Amino acid sequence: MSAAFDPSSYATQLDAKVARLRELLAPFGAPEPAVFDSPREHYRLRAEFRLWREDGQRHYAMFAPGEKHKAILIDDFPIASERINALMPRLKAAWQASEELGNRLFQVEFLTTLAGDAMITMCYHRPLDEAWEVEARQLAEALGVSVIGRSKGKRLVIGRDYAVEKLDVAGRVFSYRQPEGAFTQPNGAVNQKMLSWAFEAMGDREDDLLELYCGNGNFTLPLATRVRQVLATEISKTSVNAALSNLDENAVDNVRLVRLSAEELTQALNEVRPFRRLEGIDLKSYQFGTVFVDPPRAGMDPDTCELTRRFERILYISCNPETLAANIAQLQDTHRIERCALFDQFPYTHHMESGVLLVRR
């Protein structure tokens, strides 16, 4: 279910989301949510397009859900960043003018940042060779972007394989590497508001933070400045490497990062079994006051939910309010909602990002 892109109806659509969140959190005595709106257009920093052949040319195409064989041809994409919209016609002209760039090209992906960086991934149904690389290098230079070529089992990088983002949280600017193919928050303006809300909700602490699902360190960097130490977990190798680079780049030195699932971490904390990946980390030396979770759409599984119960404070960012409500229902006998927020990451859709701070009763 998606609403049409219509900036004039934005306020009405946002009101409906706020009402939905209120309704889901009402059984738990939640306070009124803080609401963080989105730019009305050009808010999406990444976009992926299939290419569709018509009249002997390849065009950017999108598809309605369940309509794989009925392409909607597009020349621009008003929800995408201004940079993506500026790059789209120039990239199209380049692949139309060059056999090397256009031959068997089937998909392109754009990643841009508020800091002005841009990366384009071009996916092919054929092997890429030096001739492609020569033309891709000229393209990258002409457009002022990094270009990545992908074909089965191979990746050629012209420039860098990540984009650089810079986000301001409470007056400090944090720099982030966003690797090609790894998850990043698509709405940069709202992400910045979300980081500021989490920073504020955390407050200045003299104890430690446990973070589950830390990704590239999006929240880790600002939250680490609020606590004594952070133990952060993540299972994606790409994200772990990006997070380590980001910690280093920002000179944040009070974070230990481990590649453990939430389930494995529970076993480690309960001393069920030792983990080699925790070598050199003394879990008993941490004084965890807060756990921060930003789980996938399915929410926390019941065991992870039970793990969070042992903490005084649970700071929870959710991309699915239904599973958030289900998790709060499991925790409500021990924790209450102290503050909550709605972040409109995905305007003109029914999706919403929300945040709650749960505090032990």
From Swiss-Prot:
Active-site residue numbers: C319 (nucleophile), E353 (proton acceptor)
GO cellular component: cytosol
Keywords: Methyltransferase, S-adenosyl-L-methionine, Transferase, tRNA processing
Reactions mediated catalytically: uridine(54) in tRNA + S-adenosyl-L-methionine = 5-methyluridine(54) in tRNA + S-adenosyl-L-homocysteine + H(+); uridine(341) in tmRNA + S-adenosyl-L-methionine = 5-methyluridine(341) in tmRNA + S-adenosyl-L-homocysteine + H(+)
Role description: Dual-specificity methyltransferase that catalyzes the formation of 5-methyluridine at position 54 (m5U54) in all tRNAs, and that of position 341 (m5U341) in tmRNA (transfer-mRNA).
Lineage: Bacteria, Pseudomonadati, Pseudomonadota, Gammaproteobacteria, Pseudomonadales
Entry protein name: tRNA/tmRNA (uracil-C(5))-methyltransferase
Gene Ontology molecular function terms on file: rRNA binding; tRNA (uracil(54)-C5)-methyltransferase activity, S-adenosyl methionine-dependent; tRNA binding
Species of provenance: Pseudomonas putida (strain ATCC 700007 / DSM 6899 / JCM 31910 / BCRC 17059 / LMG 24140 / F1)
GO biological process, one term: tRNA methylation
SUPFAM superfamilies linked: S-adenosyl-L-methionine-dependent methyltransferases (SSF53335)
Family the entry assigns: Belongs to the class I-like SAM-binding methyltransferase superfamily. RNA M5U methyltransferase family. TrmA subfamily.
Positions that bind S-adenosyl-L-methionine: Q185, Y213, N218, E234, D294
Enzyme class: transferase
Keyword Plastid annotated: no
CDD domains, per database record: AdoMet_MTases
Pfam family of the protein (one): tRNA_U5-meth_tr
Entry EC number(s): 2.1.1.-, 2.1.1.35
